[in-house]
Amino acid sequence: MNIEAYPHDFRGSLAVVSATGVAGCRTWTLRSVETGKHYELAPASIEGWPLPAKREDSRPNSIIVNYDGNDVIALELATGELYRTRAPATTLRLRR
């Protein structure tokens, strides 16, 4: 299987093949539904890319590529669009 780096200008539907790493910082292997090509998407490979800001609730069926504590970088699987959004509010509280 030939795996290419995820291209910045990719647009199309994707399927997840596999993921490695920890939640919030994973390397994803993706397959284009249209062409069958495989791509690798890692947090380090998209550093510095200009990413549009989106509302979190407007993008279902997305995967989290990176989470730095403030922002989430996610990929919408239906379109192949990478975007940045605010981290979701958490309701977890630590007991003291």
From Swiss-Prot:
Gene giving rise to this polypeptide: traA
Natural source organism: Escherichia coli
Keywords for this protein: Plasmid
Identification of the protein by name: Protein TraA
One Pfam family this sequence matches: DUF5440
